[in-house]
């Protein structure tokens, strides 16, 4: 696989159609990749079958195509990556960096859900956790938010890598796949900012490279909640991408007058790449004017 100086990605979970918040992350990561002269790819994070919606991943890919956001590399599906995750787990178990655990959430409730030592005997249902030693501060420089520091031992505890029901945990799958694909830059929503330190610990344990990180501000609904399917965020309209693209451009802090009001999707994206400025990206999550504008255009 080639090793570009910049390879970004958009990695949706197939729990429903893409919405405006999804577009902000996809468009933002795509623009940053194009601005850097790099590549951008799509990965379907379908490791949680109980939450997956039938046909959702295909619809998500159709939406990205309608919005002109094409993956430069073949689309990867995490549901087809069991062998890679198993190999990573076995390696960590063999080196003592991971261990089996039968502690349930109820068992850990008295510790605030944070696992520092097993309190339940091993049973038939066993998770696998990354062993996090005491005093495990992890710091990194986010390209938008600056220095971020977290004591993973105190704040998170031993990290689940494989759930007791046998499904892979997000933290393991994302680290293994970012490394396998050669992802150099992770651009995603700020709701995943506090997941980054535990992913960095896992990267160190596996001996894989650490990407650069940039966490975009979240788009909030009228009640101040993150736009999401669970909170009723409407699906993007594949038949009319321009209003949502204009609104997402504004949500990324860019100058609205830089893009033509009437254009093909291809022309609009060409102009977006030409005029995009990372220095204008906002840092604060908010009920953004872009969200309001997009909703007005839909009404």
UniProtKB/Swiss-Prot annotation:
Positions of L-glutamate binding: 9-13, 45, 170, 188
Motif annotated as 'KMSKS' region, chain positions: 226-230
**What InterPro entries does this protein map onto?**
Glu-Q_tRNA(Asp)_Synthase, Glu/Gln-tRNA-synth, Glu/Gln-tRNA-synth_Ib_cat-dom, GluQ/Sye, Rossmann-like_a/b/a_fold
Database matches in Pfam families: tRNA-synt_1c (PF00749)
> What's its EC?
6.1.1.-
Q: Which UniProt keywords apply?
A: Aminoacyl-tRNA synthetase, ATP-binding, Ligase, Metal-binding, Nucleotide-binding, Zinc
PANTHER family this protein is in?
GLUTAMATE--TRNA LIGASE (PTHR43311), GLUTAMYL-Q TRNA(ASP) SYNTHETASE (PTHR43311:SF1)
Family as reported in the entry's similarity comment: Belongs to the class-I aminoacyl-tRNA synthetase family. GluQ subfamily.
Job description of the protein: Catalyzes the tRNA-independent activation of glutamate in presence of ATP and the subsequent transfer of glutamate onto a tRNA(Asp). Glutamate is transferred on the 2-amino-5-(4,5-dihydroxy-2-cyclopenten-1-yl) moiety of the queuosine in the wobble position of the QUC anticodon.
Q: What is this protein called?
A: Glutamyl-Q tRNA(Asp) synthetase
Gene behind this protein: gluQ
